[in-house]
């Protein structure tokens, strides 16, 4: 089960997400569902059905889990998804 403690080592496809900070101000506020992930990007399907490609390194994401929301710096998500799932993360988050 996905929790705030293991989100960095979990599959992101299918999660609801919102961009809360970004270098490109036009990206802030984009909401939707993660439909694809590459090494450096997340593909988000917006509510109107359009897909938007967001670079991980310039955004902060707010993922909606069951019962809570988790804010994640996109730089921590960089890497191929299958490698990130195996990687050990030594960062503690203040909740």
From Swiss-Prot:
The keyword Lyase does not apply. Pfam families: RNase_P-MRP_p29. The gene is rnp1. It is an enzyme of class 3 (hydrolase). It catalyses: Endonucleolytic cleavage of RNA, removing 5'-extranucleotides from tRNA precursor. GO terms for biological process: tRNA 5'-leader removal. Gene3D superfamilies: Ribonuclease P/MRP, subunit p29. This is Ribonuclease P protein component 1. It is found in: Cytoplasm. GO terms for molecular function: ribonuclease P activity; ribonuclease P RNA binding.
